Amino acid sequence: MSIEKVRAAFAALEIADRIRELDESSATVALAAQALGCEPRRIAKTLSFQGKEQPILIVAAGDGKIDNHRFKERFGVKAKMLAAEEVPEKIGHAVGGVCPFAVNEGVEVYLDDSLRRFETVFPACGSSNSAIDTISKFTCAICSRLFRACVRSFHLA
């Protein structure tokens, strides 16, 4: 199970107890905000795209939008989201639980500047009913430290 991979990785940082498993679905920004009792923009949504060679994850605020022109400028390819059936194999998490933690080798993770507006954000933790409340700067640190992700901050829209 994907959440177990995240839990094991977080155990190494002694933060596994901060994972929140919810009684209701958190598979979308709206559902996660409702389940967590926060504004939708504070949900750190993780979007899956196909890069030139490897998959790309972009973590953005719940109200963030992808600017197709800027995406192509930055990555050299048109913004094309992975099909739902491709996501588990290419990323390591199923749609609804995709997160920047414990992803497959070679997946590049990018954090959008839209996250900087908030002291804390809520990314998923590998399942469609989980989240962790985290300081946005900490999200960047655990992505780069634990999972050797290519973490960059940039503004897409």
Per-region residue spans from a language model:
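Extended, low-hydrophobicity, polar/charged segments
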Residues: 1-157
